[in-house]
């Protein structure tokens, strides 16, 4: 996603009780929650819900003016199915920001990913709708045609918000492969001291023995074998 993930290393004694291990895991999860909360999910979720209601209202206004057959976005009901998904994803983003449990963050990540895909589809439909009616609608119904342009812009903004929430949710729940848990053995290391070894001289090699007197390796008088 964004840059390289930072490596987090935790050292756990091998004989540590389960309570200490759970505390360490809890601390690591708290760091992940901080990553998610840095993305301001409550604020972004509120903006998602607001965009959804605006798009829904604009779609109704265009339909009530009886010119909906001229707008491709309204014919395909993009303001309605897109708005429903935006409300759902925005509500989950707010809930995950209030109670950032792992299940809530993963749910927010999944729904915002789907919402971003639908936002792309709605944006493409909106662009085609605006381009196809740039000569007809803007001359006959400039105010209504401007609403279609506004819906397209809001769909693009919704895409950016959904991708942002998904990115921070992924950093908190998925991208944790760089975290390393090091377990140390509980038993202390035992140092064993080996007895000293007596080094004896090596006999000369065969080629060196030719130049050595024969009685060099014989026992001298008074020596003990």
Swiss-Prot record:
Transmembrane feature ranges: 43-63, 74-94, 114-134, 149-169
Topology relative to the membrane: Multi-pass membrane protein
Keyword terms of this UniProt record: Membrane, Receptor, Transmembrane, Transmembrane helix
Primary localization: membrane
Summary of the tissues where the protein is detected: Expressed in thymus, spleen, peripheral lymph node, liver, kidney, heart, colon, lung, and testes.
GO terms under cellular component: membrane
Subcellular location: Membrane
Protein origin, superkingdom: Eukaryota
Regions of this protein lying in the Cytoplasmic compartment: 1-42, 95-113, 170-225
Residue intervals on the Extracellular side: 64-73, 135-148
Keyword Endoplasmic reticulum: no
Function: May be involved in signal transduction as a component of a multimeric receptor complex.
Family to which this protein belongs: Belongs to the MS4A family.
Protein name: Membrane-spanning 4-domains subfamily A member 4D
Gene behind the chain: Ms4a4d
